[in-house]
């Protein structure tokens, strides 16, 4: 170690330790990565290294220890790669230039139209020799001697700022801590495109320290003109032009305050750019705050990225971020970046600039920029992703968009349920609902077909792995499905928010979509359900056969509505939703609330008896109808919740009317009766924790309804087909019961999601696979043919686990046992 010479080189304001190996300064690649190029993606750096054919030197133990001694590498590092100073410079220049170029190239065409790139840019783009070897070296620190630029020396003079008319202009090179380095001013007006385009390749020109030269080139447009141009081109007048200079980086400007004080606003001094600018190249921070620099550098990302990006943290931040923005939102960002990323760029740029402002240090800036870039990307990508998920159908649903917006409005109108959900934008819940919710939402576009199909598919695929029985389950769990789809989808996100609210919103959205959608599809169903008011009506047998028990389910739905009626907010929303579902669905069909009545979900016994045999097919169809109905119901709920809270009462009245046919719980049972889950649980599923359950439902399928009973006080009810009276009993207490259950469920769901997921003893003694039949003989406890019992198979029944399309691999306990295997 004694013979190893080490030292420190400051590059672009970053202090790098080096070892002298074979007469060469060798820098730790890890430090170059983390400190010097920290705001540049590693992959980019590696690509540049490969492109530049950087030669790596692997440290031996002694060198490693020495590097640790000078804190160039982590003390726990087991190995280190060194690269020569030349390679560091080349890599730094390349990475910075490339980053700029990437973004700028796209803008170059536009920028070219504006101006030819200033020589400074050409120099920046020029081979690093021009940059590095020239007086203006980006590599400030590496060649400690390289720093002295006549300009930089001048820029250090307090009066220099006064001398520099363009002090307010962005400086390519921002001052390094403790000293001013020549900053090449990028004319605010100049689009980074200029830099990029053009003449970078053939026109590489070393920067002339002569300020006049730079100013003429860079500031060919006076800041005022530049400001106008900026405003015009980049919308950056605020951030790019002197004003930002005042706004954003007073922190930074404190260095420049004397300069700025001396420097008139660019608009005021058109001659500034013409004045000799010793600092043109070297304005340390003269008037460019990091913000400005970032704005400028953002546009002059080259310069900024070259030297100023690191030197002026804002520059690097905004330039890189905006570069990436530019890459991502090149055209938008050009304008927006020009405006400091007027919009997104503006946010991030502002944040970054602010952070940069706060931390003049380039490293702080760099981190900010990295994070900001990522955040920006995230934010940029996010809307697309959101839209991609939800809006892809949303566009399809744009026709139904009116409905969907209405749903959104409805969602907005849901004050009580949406209070917490309200904050979320419709798009948000579209996202939250994921595809399922998005599907209902988008289904309006497809309306009848899209929504049911997607939803059925989703429900089968998403809600329940078991597509066949799943459809039965789904059908029986329509409420849950609606919830699972509407709420379940949203549930993952909505779980924290009131899923019920989200669901209601979704439901409303879906409802709006669905009334059209399902009513379109289910108009017959609605009619049939209307016929199903008689619940037995087979006039709708076409769809009744499809949904033989839909009348029951319809009745259940009204009953369910009655249940929500008990729960004032939930009931109002649910009943209103149900009523609205009735109204909407019925409106779609016969515009009669009986639609929901007709939507009556198949009774457990029917479900149990028929669902598993012929009903499997019918069940799926029924389930689809019911699902549509349930979703209608949910959407109706949501919509009702919006507009029909009174209607909810109306719905209550209707549900009460319907309740006789099936109590709210009966309805919920109707919906989930096949699953044997009581309505309160359904309500909870819909309005409360059950929505969370819907998350599981989404994962597991509709099972949560079945599993609801174990968790719920309604367990017995859920397990056994709930008589109407029984349901009514809950209906009477449903408000309290649902609220209680919901609360319990929310609490227990939260807890159950955490602790109840696996209740060994609760799940262990699975129901016997063989039982003694009425004839005294052994009978399979479970079969697809358990029509003997009016009740659906026990929740532990394999049918719930091993349905067609279901996973043969048991679900994780958190999903498997939560209200499922009880």
Swiss-Prot record:
Residue spans of biased composition, Polar residues class: 660-675
Gene3D superfamilies on file: Ski
Biased composition (Acidic residues): 319-338
The keyword Cell division appears for this protein: no
Biased composition (Low complexity): 278-318
Keywords of the record: Isopeptide bond, Ubl conjugation
Annotated spans, Disordered: 245-370, 658-677, 706-732
Basic residues composition-biased segments: 245-261
Record-listed cross-link Glycyl lysine isopeptide (Lys-Gly) (interchain with G-Cter in SUMO2), residues: 602
SUPFAM superfamilies associated with the record: Putative DNA-binding domain
Family affiliation: Belongs to the DACH/dachshund family.
Protein name per the record: SKI/DACH domain-containing protein 1
Taxonomic source organism: Mus musculus
Upper taxonomic lineage: Eukaryota, Metazoa, Chordata, Craniata, Vertebrata
Record gene name: Skida1
């Amino acid at each position: 170690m004694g013979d190893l010479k080490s030292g420190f080189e400051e590059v672009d304001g970053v202090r790098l330790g080096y070892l002298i190996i074979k007469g060469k300064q060798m820098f730790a690649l890890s430090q170059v990565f983390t400190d010097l190029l920290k705001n540049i993606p590693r992959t980019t750096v590696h690509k540049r290294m490969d492109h530049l054919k950087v030669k790596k030197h692997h440290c031996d133990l002694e060198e490693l220890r020495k590097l640790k001694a000078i804190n160039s590498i982590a003390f726990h590092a087991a190995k280190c790669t060194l690269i020569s100073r030349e390679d560091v410079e080349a890599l730094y220049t390349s990475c910075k230039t490339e980053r700029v170029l990437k973004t700028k190239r796209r803008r170059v065409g536009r920028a070219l139209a504006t101006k030819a790139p200033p020589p400074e840019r050409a120099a920046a783009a020029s081979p690093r020799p021009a940059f590095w070897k020239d007086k203006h070296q980006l590599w400030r620190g590496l060649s400690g001697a390289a720093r002295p630029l006549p300009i930089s020396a001048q820029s250090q003079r307090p009066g220099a700022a006064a001398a520099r008319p363009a002090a307010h202009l962005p400086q390519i090179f921002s001052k390094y801590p403790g000293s001013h380095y020549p900053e090449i001013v990028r004319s605010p007006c100049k689009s980074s495109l200029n830099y990029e385009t053009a003449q970078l390749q053939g026109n590489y020109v070393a920067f002339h320290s002569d300020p006049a030269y730079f100013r003429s080139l860079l500031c060919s447009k006076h800041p005022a003109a530049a400001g106008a141009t900026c405003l015009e081109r980049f919308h950056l007048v605020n951030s790019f032009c002197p004003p930002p200079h005042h706004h954003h980086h007073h922190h930074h400007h404190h260095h420049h305050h004397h300069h700025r004080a001396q420097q008139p606003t660019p608009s005021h001094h058109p001659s500034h750019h013409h004045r000799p600018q010793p600092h043109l190249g070297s304005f340390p921070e003269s008037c460019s705050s990091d913000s400005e620099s970032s704005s400028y550098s953002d546009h002059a990302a080259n310069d900024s990225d070259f030297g100023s990006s690191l030197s002026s943290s804002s520059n690097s931040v905004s330039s890189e971020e905006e570069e990436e923005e530019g890459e991502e939102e090149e055209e938008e960002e050009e304008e927006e970046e020009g405006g400091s990323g007027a919009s997104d760029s503006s946010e991030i740029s502002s944040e970054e600039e602010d952070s940069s402002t706060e931390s003049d240090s380039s490293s702080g800036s760099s981190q900010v920029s990295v994070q900001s870039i990522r955040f920006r990307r995230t934010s940029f990508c996010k809307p697309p992703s959101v839209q991609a998920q939800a809006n892809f159908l949303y566009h399809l649903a744009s026709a139904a968009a009116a409905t969907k917006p209405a749903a959104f409005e409805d969602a907005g109108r849901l004050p009580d349920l949406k209070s917490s959900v309200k904050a979320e934008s419709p798009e948000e819940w579209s996202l939250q609902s994921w595809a399922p919710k998005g599907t209902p939402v988008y289904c309006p576009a497809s309306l009848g077909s899209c929504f049911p199909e997607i939803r059925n598919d989703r429900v089968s695929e998403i809600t329940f792995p078991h597509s066949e029985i799943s459809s039965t389950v789904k059908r029986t769990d329509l409420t849950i499905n609606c919830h699972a789809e509407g709420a379940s989808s949203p549930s993952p996100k909505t779980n924290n928010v009131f899923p019920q609210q989200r669901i209601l919103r979704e439901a409303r959205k879906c409802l709006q979509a669905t009334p059209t959608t399902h009513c379109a599809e289910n108009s017959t169903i609605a009619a049939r359900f209307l016929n199903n008011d008689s619940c037995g009506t087979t006039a709708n047998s076409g769809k009744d056969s499809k949904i033989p028990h839909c009348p029951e389910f319809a009745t259940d739905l009204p009953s369910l509505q009655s249940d929500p009626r008990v729960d004032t907010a939930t009931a109002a929303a649910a009943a209103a939703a149900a009523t609205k579902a009735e109204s909407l669905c019925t409106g779609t069909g016969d515009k009669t609330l009986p639609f929901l009545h007709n939507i009556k979900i198949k009774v457990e016994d029917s479900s149990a008896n028929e669902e598993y045999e012929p009903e499997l097919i019918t069940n799926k169809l029924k389930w689809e109808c019911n699902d549509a109905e349930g979703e209608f119901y949910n959407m109706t709920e949501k919509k009702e919740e919006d507009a029909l809270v009174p209607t909810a009462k109306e719905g209550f009245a209707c549900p009460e009317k319907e309740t006789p046919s099936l109590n709210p719980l009966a309805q919920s049972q109707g919906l989930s009766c096949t699953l044997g889950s009581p309505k309160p649980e359904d309500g909870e599923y819909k309005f409360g924790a059950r929505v969370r359950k819907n998350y599981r439902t989404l994962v597991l399928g509709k099972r949560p309804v079945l599993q609801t009973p174990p968790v719920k006080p309604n367990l017995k009810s859920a397990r056994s087909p709930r008589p109407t009276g029984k349901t009514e009993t809950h209906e009477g207490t449903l408000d309290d019961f649902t609220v209680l259950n919901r609360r319990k469920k929310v609490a227990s769901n939260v807890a159950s999601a955490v602790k109840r997921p696996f209740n060994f003893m609760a799940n262990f003694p699975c129901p016997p696979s063989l039982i003694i039949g009425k004839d005294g003989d052994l009978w399979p406890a479970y079969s697809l043919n358990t029509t003997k019992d009016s009740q659906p198979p026990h929740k532990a029944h394999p049918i719930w686990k091993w349905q067609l399309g279901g996973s043969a691999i048991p679900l994780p306990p958190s999903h498997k046992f939560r209200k499922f295997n009880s």
